[in-house]
A protein has these predicted regions:
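Extracellular/periplasmic bilobal clamshell ligand-binding domains
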Residues: 78, 89, 184-191
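Structural motif
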Residues: 20-23, 48, 70-84, 153-157
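Periplasmic-binding protein-like
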Residues: 38-41, 89-99, 105, 116-121, ...
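Extracellular/periplasmic periplasmic-binding protein-like sensory domains
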Residues: 106-179
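Extracytoplasmic ligand/sensor domains, especially the bilobed periplasmic-binding protein
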Residues: 1-68, 117-142, 150
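Extracytoplasmic "Venus flytrap"
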Residues: 40-49, 97-100, 148-149, 171-177
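Second-shell loop/turn segments in exported
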Residues: 8-14, 83, 143-150, 167-172, ...
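Beta-alpha junction/loop-to-helix N-cap segments that form part of ligand/metal-binding clefts
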Residues: 1-7, 13, 71-78, 98-103
Length: 191
């Protein structure tokens, strides 16, 4: 997260994790109207940053955090922690995972018949890594992401259409961020 604090010629094309975490907190408290939440936190800088921002906003707006459980990236077995969360019966599970881990969490939650709503970050915004792996278990999952697929901006719409034509799948946040970075480099070269 501190990489872009290094100087005036270092840029970021996406928001910091704690900012996106606050967006998740807003989504949980205001849009999904959750009163209680369990947090599944990927144990790295990104996951920790998301969790910090989420908890900061959510608790300030009346959401009670029932549990905070960390997991290592690449974890395969989430059933024990999901069983614990099922007993707590939160209104919402906030999941900071990347695509594959997030998909496994959803599949294992479905296997345990957990009906709790799930909120994730841009880490889940991946057609191949998340949606194809999670399958039907991804139905109803809400994510916060900086890719606005409803944008009327012609650059965005052109990107969305051409990406799908080129690769045969819907674009995700990672591809969009890469495209933004490329456009920034092109603009800098022109100037």
């Amino acid at each position: 997260p501190a990489v872009t604090a290094g100087g005036k010629y270092v840029f970021r094309v996406t928001v910091l994790g704690h900012v996106q975490g606050r967006a998740g907190g807003y989504t949980a408290a205001k849009l999904m109207e959750a009163k209680t939440v369990s947090m599944l936190i990927m144990d790295n800088d990104f996951g920790q940053s998301l969790a910090k921002g989420f908890k900061e906003y959510a608790t300030k707006h009346g959401v009670k955090v029932l549990s905070e459980d960390k997991f290592k990236m690449g974890e395969k077995e989430f059933s024990p922690v999901l069983t614990k969360i099922k007993k707590l019966n939160p209104d919402l599970i906030y999941n900071t995972a990347y695509p594959h881990d997030g998909a496994l969490i959803l599949k294992q939650a479905a296997d345990l018949d957990i009906q709790t709503k799930m909120l994730g970050s841009e880490g889940l915004d991946s057609t191949k890594g998340f949606l194809e792996v999670a399958g039907k278990a991804a139905e109803g999952v809400v994510i916060t992401t900086n890719l606005d697929r409803d944008s009327k901006n012609p650059i965005t719409q052109n990107y969305l259409i051409n990406y799908e034509k080129q690769y045969g799948i819907a674009p995700d946040m990672t591809g969009a961020s890469t495209y933004d970075a490329f456009l920034m480099v092109v603009d800098a070269i022109k100037k």
